[in-house]
């Protein structure tokens, strides 16, 4: 990274930390510094009222560029465009398609379809649901289906049928048997069967470089009352468990890792939420 210059600040006298502290104490007029100005976070550390350059000495990752380890600024190197996504529950295929087309006209470029968990969707069903929705332009995500393998096969076959350019297809299936075990106390089918499904999903997704098939849903932990640290710990542990179990089944880490998608809960505590996403990128890297 280029070294920062101070050309704009040459006329301003540097202010020592001790001078800041002296001024703060004066303005407090005897009030307790710790109680008034120090934020005691639920994550177990105290946030000071201000920070200075010396506080970030040694934090080399702050100088990293997007696309470089440890990826705290993401992996995109040409732009930083984010998908704008809207979720919708699919009760009726035609009505869901109409709603999807309507919101796409309003600027949405990512769709999250929450499917009937018990229904096995055919290629014809997906044709109705995704009519006039172009997978090379719109990110298409499926949530909730217990028949993830059949869904993936049918979606992939439809992409082939319509000659979609696989390198431009973005989306996800979000199959999460560990999440199912955590929230429901049981697997979709069985431990062995669900992990075998994960493996087969990854094998199909090998043709779709921007389509992820395994979802780690940190929102489950967030909504159960986990702190930021706990949500990160539980989510990353689930990710590591998928890596461990699936590499034991013959897949390489390079097969598995790119196919895992993490979702985290976001609250009104924005600074901590931003820190959580950056920390997740760093720890997973």
Task: Pin down the residues of each PLM region.
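Extended amphipathic alpha-helical segments enriched in small hydrophobics
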Residues: 273-285
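Catalytic alpha/beta active-site cores
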Residues: 1-269, 273
